[in-house]
Amino acid sequence: SAIEKANAVILNEARSNPELQGMGTTLVAALDRGDSFTIASVGDSRAYLWAHGELRLITKDQTWVQEVGRPLGLDEETLQKHPLRHVLTMALGVSEALDVRLYDIQTEPGAFLLLSSDGLHGLVTPDQIQRILGDDLEVPNTLQEKCLHLINAARAAGGPDNITAVLIAAS
């Protein structure tokens, strides 16, 4: 797949250049299939579905918190303060073994996807995202304007970089 090829390219670059060793990246991508989307995810970049005025997380983070902490039964307060809370369990460019997670979701006109990096969803709460994506008269209406509003909200919350927001309207 294209994701596996990207992983191989990143690994080869890191192996051939010592300054790049240890680099990696997360990924979330969506394929529009008309009345549905197929979403691919590696790491902690996320896909959300906005439909009927509600925001729903589609992907599951590949992080220590999601894959180790929660199954151990640690409470949310402990997880939010845990020293391993930001540790990824999977990323492109880290290993030849790659766990690409795939999700298929049905959509309908008026719905859209939000693809985001942790620079956005790590700083802007789901409630804030929902308000920005909703029909609030204080928030611009086009998808491009909503993306800019999301990015500005992350910057206002202290996000210096790595803030990605992509909105894709359902067909």
State the predicted function of each range:
Residues 1-171:
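PP2C/PPM-type serine/threonine phosphatase catalytic domain
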